[in-house]
Amino acid sequence: MYITCLDVEGVLVPEIWIAFAEASGIPELKKTTRDEPDYDKLMNWRLGVLKEHGLGLKEIQDVIAKIDPLPGAKEFLDELRSFSQVILISDTFTQFAAPLMEKLGRPTLFCNTLEVADNGEITGFKMRVEQSKLTTVKALQSIGFDTIASGDSYNDLGMIQASKAGFLFRSTDKIKADYPDIPAYEEYDELLAAIRNAMK
């Protein structure tokens, strides 16, 4: 029994923090896990920048409401779900992801939660588990699934390498060069074909 595990940002939807950085005029918020592999460090730094600028959850949600999935992402996901169980595994937060999941046809999403004060200030974050992507893939394997995984970033490498088949999708030149053994694709139809092939 196969189950496909996909990263979300950079694979199906634009990077939320990059979109927010552009809309808010705070270019330093463009830093993502592609640049900083330590997610805790990255998030604590982001929260500090938000606090410094007096920006809270509402401001970020207003931007997210205007973000659409990447062109072709919904069709790709619909096609993939027609022949595979699919779980989206992301380091994003439920409070950010809801409007985007609506636009993708409400797929199953495993992610994290923000801690938000009554005034809307994001005060912290609660990770579901340590190394959530790798931990989730291993848990699925422990209950009899063969996993196929794809993502674009450093924090996807664990689940990609631990899966029966794993692929980079629209990743950086550096990650592709550092991990030449992982097949890398740029187009949804290529990724679909690779996933189908892995299930044979």
Describe each PLM feature range:
Residues 86-91, 145-186:
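Acidic, Mg2+-coordinating phosphoryl-transfer loop and its flanking beta/alpha structural elements
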Residues 110, 182-191:
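Short acidic-hydrophobic, aromatic-tinged amphipathic segments that line or gate anion-handling sites
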Residues 95-147, 178:
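Substrate-recognition "cap/lid" segment bordering the active-site pocket of phosphatases
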Residues 94-98, 156-157, 192:
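Short, well-ordered alpha-helical microsegments
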Residues 194-200:
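Short amphipathic alpha-helix with an adjacent loop that forms part of the alpha/beta core around
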Residues 113-116, 171-175, 189-191:
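Short, acidic/turn-prone active-site loops that include or flank metal/cofactor-
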Residues 2-113, 117-118:
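Alpha-helical substrate-recognition element adjacent to the catalytic core
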Residues 78, 138, 157-158:
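Alpha-helical segments flanking ligand/cofactor-binding loops in enzyme cores
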